[in-house]
Amino acid sequence: MPRQRLDRRINAQVLLWALGVIIVDTLSKWWARHALGTKGRHVWGPLWLRLTYNGGISFSLDRSGPVVTTLVVLAIVLVVMFVAFQATPGLATVGFGLLLGGGVSNEIDRLVRVPHQVTDFISVGWFPIFNLADASVTVGFIVLMVAMLRGSSLVQR
């Protein structure tokens, strides 16, 4: 397959994974804002659904304020996009798509929500409350680590 055609296919795969994350995460946050009350819902064991809002980046980290947080996240997203569009076929495209989708989805939520906070609603008790975009970023990172451990190059040379 010619290099240019392969590049377009990889770009499309990364963007499809990212778009899937953005859609699912946005719908889950909408549901959480409309369905969860102030008490939350016990699901099973330590898992609770509790609505809260987070001004930080991920898992309530870095509360520097909306401008700094937005600039940091946008810089990270641009770097991930640059690297992702040079990804090798396979696990790397999935990992980069999950990273990109999670970062973009949280940033969309932060930009449209006043006072520039992200909707979080998944609680496991001992860990900061998070959302599906946070989980997507974490899983994307793990997928990239697995790809590297299997000897895959993450980007084309």
What would you call each of these model-derived segments?
Residues M1-R157:
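Alpha-helical transmembrane bundles and membrane-interface segments of multipass inner-membrane proteins
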